[in-house]
Amino acid sequence: MSTDPVQVLQPDGFNKSRWTQLPRDVLIGHQAIMQLPDIIADIKPGRSVLLISGGTTREVAGNTVADILKDQYEVRRFVAGKLDADTLEACSQASSSADFLIGVGGGRVIDCAKIVSYKQGKPFISVPTAASHDGIISGRATLPTETGSVSVGAHPPIAVVADTGIISQAPHRLMASGCADVISNYTAILDWELAHRLRGEQISEYAIALSKMTAEILVKDANLIKPGQEEAAWIVVKALVSSGVSMAIAGSSRPASGGEHKFGHALERLMPGAALHGEACGIGSIMTMYLHGGDWREIRSSLARIGAPTTPRELNIPDEVIVEALMKARDIRPERFTILDMGLTRESAEHLVQMLYEE
C-alpha cells in the first residue's frame, strides 16, 4: 500500500457573473398614462425632462404627457422625424440639460430616446403608443442605415408605461406586427439551441423557457387579438414585455432573434420599408420552422388569425426578393449561427417561398 499522502482534487472555481438590466417599473393598463407622475415620483430621476415624440404621436399622447407633467417638472419637447445621425445629434443637444428622457411613440421614437439616453448616461421612460415590436422594453435599438438597418446596444428603459387604451387605437397592422415578432421567438430559440449543439454557444435555459412560454400564450390567445380591442392590447403588450425580459436575462437578443430576424434585416436592405419588422420576422419564422422540421403550419395559422401577413404577395413583395433575402441572410450578423447558415441553396430557398402558398 502506498504511503503517499492523499491528493485532494480542487475543482475549478465558479466564476460566472451576469449583469441583468431590467426596467424598475412596468405599468400596463387602462389610462396608465395618467399614472405617469406617480411612476416618476417613485423613480426620482430629477426635475427636468426632455419629452421625445413623433409628429403623429405628439398629438396621440405627447401633448397629454406634457400637460400632466408641466406643473411638477420642467418639460422640454423634441420631435423625432426620421431616425438618423442628424436626428440623434439634435436630440442629444436638446437633452443636454435634462435629467431624464421620456419617449412617447412607436419604435422609431423609443429607439431615439433609448440611444440618446444611453450615450448620455441618463435614464429614460418608455411610453409606447403602439405594440409593434419588443423594442419597447429591450436594451437594443434598431438604427436605419443606407443599406437597411443595424441593431445597436443601448440600455432598457428605467420604466415602461403602456396605456392599453391608446395602443388599441393604433392601426391594427402595428399590433399584428408585434404579435408576429413574439411568435417568431419559437424559431429564434430553436436556432439558439442549434448553435449550442453545433458551435458550443452558451444558452440560458431560463431565457429560453420565458421566450417560448410568451410565444405559446400569444398563439393560444390569437383569436382574442382583434382591431380596436383594449383587451388585445393588454395581451400583446404583456407578451412584448415578457419577450424583452427574456433578452435581458440572456444578456443578448438571442431568445428572440434568430434566422427569421436575419432574413428580416436582409429583406429590409433589399426593399426598405416594404414590410414592418415583425411582419418580415413572422414570414421568416414560417420558413425557418419548416427547415427545423417543426410545425410551420401552426405558426402560419396563428399569424393569419391575428391578421399578420403570411406570404410575400400580401405585402406586394416579389417572390424572388424573398429568395434573395434568404440567400443574403447569412451575411447579416455572421457571428450569429442559425439554420440559414447551414448551406441553404437557391433551389431550396425557392421551394421555401412556394411552400408559403400551400394550402
Swiss-Prot record:
The cofactor note reads: Binds 1 zinc ion per subunit.
Show the CDD domains listed in the entry: Gro1PDH
| SUPFAM superfamilies, A to Z | Dehydroquinate synthase-like
What is the top-level taxon of the source organism? Answer: Archaea
The reaction(s) catalysed by this protein are: sn-glycerol 1-phosphate + NAD(+) = dihydroxyacetone phosphate + NADH + H(+); sn-glycerol 1-phosphate + NADP(+) = dihydroxyacetone phosphate + NADPH + H(+)
Indicate the enzyme's highest-level EC class: oxidoreductase
| Single GO molecular function | metal ion binding
Q: Which positions bind Zn(2+)?
A: D181, H261, H277
Pathway noted in the entry = Membrane lipid metabolism; glycerophospholipid metabolism
Residues that coordinate or bind NAD(+): G107, R108, V109, I110, D111, T129, A130, A131, S132, S138
Q: Name one GO biological process term.
A: glycerophospholipid metabolic process
Q: List, separated by semicolons, the cofactors it needs.
A: Zn(2+)
EC numbers for this chain: 1.1.1.261
| Record: residues binding substrate | D134, D181, H265
Q: Name the major location.
A: cytoplasm
GO CC, alphabetical: cytoplasm
**Is Lipid biosynthesis included in the keywords of this UniProt record?**
yes
**InterPro entries recorded for this chain?**
G1P_dehydrogenase_arc (IPR023002), G1PDH (IPR032837), Glycerol_DH (IPR016205)
Write out the function statement from the record: Catalyzes the NAD(P)H-dependent reduction of dihydroxyacetonephosphate (DHAP or glycerone phosphate) to glycerol 1-phosphate (G1P). The G1P thus generated is used as the glycerophosphate backbone of phospholipids in the cellular membranes of Archaea.
Family, as annotated:
Belongs to the glycerol-1-phosphate dehydrogenase family.
Protein name (Swiss-Prot/TrEMBL): Glycerol-1-phosphate dehydrogenase [NAD(P)+]
Q: Which organism is it from?
A: Methanospirillum hungatei JF-1 (strain ATCC 27890 / DSM 864 / NBRC 100397 / JF-1)
